[in-house]
Amino acid sequence: MAGSERGVKHNMMTHVGTMTVETDRLLLRKFAYNDDESMLKNWVADEKVQAMYAEPTYTTKEAVRGLLDKYIGGYESPNYYRWAIFEKDGAECIGQIAYFLMDDKNHFGEIEYCIGEAFQRKGYATEATKAAIAYGFEQVGLHKVQISHMSNNLPSRRVIEKCGFCYEGTQRDYFYVDGQYVDRLFYSMLEEEYHTME
């Protein structure tokens, strides 16, 4: 089997659920229903932000509460990892980051994130992504973390490169957005690479 020559043994993953994480400037915590107004204000209603990670827009409080039902309900499972992103000195949800895929059999998870337009170009996406990477390797025991971006999303490419991911390949015409096909660029980081960077 391809890759078996590496001979890397791995301990079992330990699911711990979504716990609060603090970085230098950010607070990552579970979503709550009272996040609805700042979510609407900062990102979920923004077509440009949502399109960059292939998500629909949510333009009413009722729609956002439906989304929050899904997010908050997910916290009942210990293998569900989704954080609301806040500035430490702020009271508004400025984005989100999650492991939207967890593969227990093969010991990997895949990250997605978004940051509201008004809070971009501040390094927040990189800071939150590095925190999620550390959580995956140190708390959950992942062997590999994956991430991707649309070929037309150059800011996400810069975030991914700053975090130290290794480019794996391009999935051609993976997304269909606004009447055209867009490639998906795929990256990963192995646990030994993560520990080398620490």
Predicted regions and their residues:
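Hydrophobic residues in alpha-helical segments
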Residues: 43-44, 53, 75-76
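Conserved GNAT-fold acetyl-CoA-binding loop/helix
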Residues: 49-70
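A short helix-loop-beta-strand connector motif used in the catalytic cores of GNAT acetyltransferases and
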Residues: 70-84
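A short hydrophobic/aromatic micro-motif that marks alpha-helical segments and, especially, helix-coil
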Residues: 60-62, 75, 194
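Sparse recognition of residues in long alpha-helices and their boundaries
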Residues: 55-56, 80, 176
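Short, conserved alpha-helical segments within structured domains
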Residues: 59-60, 81, 152
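Acyl-donor (CoA/ACP) binding surface of acyl/acetyltransferases
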Residues: 2-38, 42-50, 86-198
